[in-house]
Amino acid sequence: MIEIIPAVLSRNYEDMKNKIALVRGILPVVQIDLCDGIFVQNTTWPFSTGGVSDINFQRILNEQEGMPFWEDIDFELDLMVADAVSNFDIYTKLAPKRIVFHIEAVGDLNEFKDFIEGIDVYIRDAIQIGIAINTTTPIEKIFPLVNSVDFVQCMGIEKIGFQGQIFDERVLNNIKTLKEKYPDLIISVDGGVNFEIAQKLIEAGVDRLVAGSLLLKAEDIRETISVLENLV
């Protein structure tokens, strides 16, 4: 069955908490989109409220509290930030299940591969590492990294960091290419997902669908999830 993951873009901590609450007890994993206003134009928590100095962010880093509803939900951090590698240790303190790096933001790919393969074994066992790729980046660029990560996230929209964008059909060819070359690779698609697009993505072999507006603005989230999970 396809895995459905809600994507949360948050103006501030309370906004994030309220959006996560919508799927609490319904879905086990939520993707938190962290946007720094540098790698992408949009800015989300904690960068929109002071960055590392944000009081809630500080409380989590100091282990005074956890992420909202951390006892019920696992988190996938989508690092749409310029400092993903240099501040990796900080992001791990949010206790994510998965972390997604963006290939366009990590710099030299050989150095990044060395970084991934050099992550402490304890951390690597606890956190799945994914690499995201934009529709405008040649899919071949990701090939050298595939065997060093746990999954690939294909962005389904050209302007990342924003929700409600139109799906970019180029991602379908990227998925096809990846599945042909790496049949066992877990592929996630983030952005532009609606029911019609979801059907195409599942037929193309996608394992995970990451959706923001489709889920969080749905009149009935449970029904929306049920429809997506039963697409074949």
Segments predicted by a language model, with ranges:
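Hydrophobic faces of well-ordered beta-strands that scaffold small-molecule active sites
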Residues: I2-V8, V30-I32, I73-L79, I99-F101, ...
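Catalytic cores of alpha/beta
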Residues: M16-V23, V85-K93, T136-S148, V193-L209
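Conserved, mostly hydrophobic/aromatic
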Residues: V23, I32-D33, Y91, V152, ...
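Structural motif
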Residues: G25-L27, W70, L94, R124, ...
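Glycine/Thr-rich beta-alpha phosphate-binding loop at enzyme active sites
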Residues: V40-T49, T135, K141-K176, E180-Y182, ...
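Alpha-helix-loop-beta-strand connector modules within alpha/beta enzyme cores
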Residues: P46-L77, F115-T135, R170-V193, V227-V232
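Hydrophobic, well-structured mid-protein blocks that either form specific transmembrane helices
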Residues: S86-E140
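Glycine-rich phosphate-binding active-site loops on the catalytic face of alpha/beta enzymes
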Residues: I99-D108, Q153-G164, A204-I225
